[in-house]
């Protein structure tokens, strides 16, 4: 009888230890954390780069799309200060003659990146959803580079590079045709199966 009384608490204690150890590192803490900062579209920045106040949301949606594709392996988190961000998004002028660019940096002993996006899209004309499409897909492409993804030659991939030619208008147009409202951007995936595989490979090396 005395043995059974002592044994039962020991089993409960063991169960508690197992439970606590399983909670010690949830998927969130096991994920690769990328803090990020997006340059505010101030009045001065808008004059210089033609950014819009909603562009920061497009950048956030792009990073959240990668996070969702990772299935919990990647976690993104906005921070208020540029210096505290592992990934930093800037708006640039048309003088750069590109849609965007990603440059590697070192952040707290980890791989980080500075991303530059051209938000001035005069070629979109009056179609604001096309303009939003171009800015969003550029953010998605360049933050993909920031996370470690390389260019591809497959037109279906968001990481496709125009160095291989292809129909640039259709690259953006195929996504634009899926949209009825701005909010559809966050609900519509532009990440291909190959992009997802490349993301998981990049994150496996951390």
Residue ranges of each PLM-predicted region?
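Zinc-dependent metalloendopeptidases
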Residues: 27-206
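Compositionally biased regions
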Residues: 3, 22-23, 27
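Bacterial N-terminal signal peptides
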Residues: 13-24
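N-terminal secretory signal peptides that target proteins for export/translocation
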Residues: 1-10
